[in-house]
């Protein structure tokens, strides 16, 4: 709800601006939030390592921007952005930077990172228990950062009726107080990712561990992502996402998420082994 609703609320705050900036390869709801608010949705190119390229943002787009979305670890590529650079970019231009950090607990290359490590002025960090604690059904999350912006969002959002029921709040608070289950889940995702890398490599598909997230971002043989999607479904019973779901820049790639149970993954591994024997 926050991702798709934020542009509308920000436009009420700054009616002279009409643009939402977001990574060119990203969760589709960033773009949809702009569309629902009647804003311009402007994708920001990524570099060769799938990190947002701030230098590619045009001055005229920055001057009209309501916000810049960043996502670390990124979905679908799992790359880690320079959040300090993103915060500095926004402050220099008066553009709020909203950092989607829902996968932060699943950072594999170095320690977890947050935009709040670079100060709170002009930034928001957005978190979700859907990923951290597997509590997607509760629709519980939180944002923190710039005091003025956080206060504004609280005061406007409460009139929309988007209030989390008390039992869901209590469950979310209990989950946030406990880190052990998060560590267990992170270790589980890491094992699953390693197993999926081995499965894909055994099929002749190049794959490697991401910097973060619980998904692999792989090149489709001959650049045909739909052929790979169909092959993995037919041969292994694995459902994947073609890269173009996340934007045109995803052409020729496939996202493979490590979200099946360990028992199901064992079946996939056996099927792959049988094919190679």
Regions flagged by a language model, labelled:
Residues 22, 43, 99, 240-242:
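Hydrophobic residues in well-ordered beta-strands that form the structural core
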Residues 231-240, 246-277:
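PLP-dependent enzyme catalytic core of the Aspartate aminotransferase-like
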Residues 48-109:
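Active-site phosphate-binding strand-loop segment of PLP-dependent enzymes
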Residues 119-190, 275-276:
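Conserved core segment of the aminotransferase class I/II
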Residues 37, 92-93, 203, 236:
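Helix C-cap/helix->beta junction micro-motif
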Residues 10, 30-34:
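Short hydrophobic alpha-helical segments of the AMP-binding
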Residues 169, 173, 189-197, 207-219, ...:
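Conserved glycine-rich beta-strand-loop-beta hairpin in the small C-terminal domain of fold type I
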Residues 1-19:
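Phosphate-binding glycine-rich loop
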């Amino acid at each position: 709800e926050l991702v798709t609703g934020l542009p509308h609320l920000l436009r009420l705050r700054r009616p002279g601006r009409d643009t939402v900036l977001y990574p060119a390869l990203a969760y589709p709801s960033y773009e949809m939030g702009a569309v629902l608010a009647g804003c311009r949705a402007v994708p920001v190119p990524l570099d060769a390592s799938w990190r947002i390229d701030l230098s590619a943002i045009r001055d005229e787009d920055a001057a009209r921007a309501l916000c810049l979305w960043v996502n670390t670890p990124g979905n679908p590529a799992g790359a880690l952005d320079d959040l300090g650079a993103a915060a500095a970019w926004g402050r220099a231009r008066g553009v709020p930077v909203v950092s989607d950090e829902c996968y932060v607990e699943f950072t594999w290359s170095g320690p977890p990172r947050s935009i709040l490590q670079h100060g709170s002025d002009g930034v928001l960090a957005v978190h979700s228990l859907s990923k951290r604690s597997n509590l997607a059904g509760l629709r519980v999350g939180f944002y923190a950062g710039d005091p003025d912006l956080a206060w504004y969002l609280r005061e406007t959002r409460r009139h929309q009726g988007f209030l989390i029921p008390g039992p869901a709040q209590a469950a979310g608070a209990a989950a946030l107080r406990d880190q052990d289950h998060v560590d267990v889940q992170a270790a589980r995702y890491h094992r699953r990712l390693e197993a999926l890398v081995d499965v894909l490599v055994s099929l002749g598909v190049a794959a490697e561990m991401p910097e973060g997230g619980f998904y692999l971002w792989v090149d489709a043989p001959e650049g045909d992502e739909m052929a790979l999607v169909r092959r993995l479904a037919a041969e292994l019973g694995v459902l994947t996402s073609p890269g173009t779901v996340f934007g045109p820049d995803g052409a020729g790639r496939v996202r493979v998420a490590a979200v099946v149970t360990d028992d199901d993954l064992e079946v996939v591994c056996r099927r792959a082994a049988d094919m190679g024997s």
